[in-house]
Amino acid sequence: MSVDRVLRLATRSSPQARTQASAVADALMTAGHRCELVFVDTEGDRSQSAGTPLHTIGGRGVFTKEVQRAVLDGRADLAAHSAKDLPTEPVDGLAVSAWTKRRSARDALIGRSLAELAPGATIATGSVRRRAQLSAVRDDLRFVELRGNIGTRLERIPKGGSIVMAVAALEVLGMTDRIAEELDPTEFVPAVGQGCVAVECRTDDEVAIAALSGVNDPMTARSVTLERAFLAELGSGCSLPVGAHHVGDVLWTFLAGAGGTIDRRSIPIDGSATVDAARAAARAALESVGGW
């Protein structure tokens, strides 16, 4: 195929997804490639519109399957995903050829800070990981479900309470002024891959692979690979209470078991056998909490 062809980049149509995909497209065009966006409706978006809690949907890839399918069936050449939404199981015929430079991986409270939250205050979040982490430091807090796009979530801050969001999502849309408190990522360990975008293409598409090599950030790729190795060893999806965050020479991990037992680890990463260390940590953490 011609190297002059237009690279069609599939993405969800939410404001955050559009902005993230547009940044990837801009990087490709700056490098001399022609690019256009292809918007795809996903199961996750449909359930979000219906207000269905994410952890009740079942299955994995609810925000990614339809976007990947657009590439596999030829409607697009590339697929852009929030990396935290991308399952660790590979899809035949596709591979991640770029991890974009990571934004902040932290979570943040919007509304009141932890210190400002009165006893029994309400936190709105759809993430079981965030609920488990906040409950560990404030067992008095109440939790209610929260889904929707960023604008919708910001309209649903409980009276006297807070919502929890990824700092990166607010950065993308220029809304960091709404943050009451950024949470320490060594205690409130972020979701795997939080803060970066994964871009897939077909494994036999040499033009797309070459184009994406200029978008890939090696440091982010290394960090997310370690985090995903931890998650893959657990056999877990994004709807379960798991976090992993690599920064510097440490992989920070969080796991909550079915009985409420919590395991936290800081694994030194010295440059050798790094993926093996992440996998070993996952096995030890799972044994510590007694399984799901």
Spans of features found by a protein language model:
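Helix N-cap/beta->alpha junction signal
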Residues: 13, 64, 127-128
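Small-molecule-sensing regulatory modules
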Residues: 2-41, 47-56, 136, 140-292
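A conserved helix-loop-strand patch within extracytoplasmic ligand-binding domains
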Residues: 83-86, 90-141
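Short, structured active-site "lid" loops
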Residues: 50-78
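Paired acidic/hydrophobic, glycine-rich loop segments that form the ligand-binding mouth/hinge
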Residues: 72, 77-82, 161-166
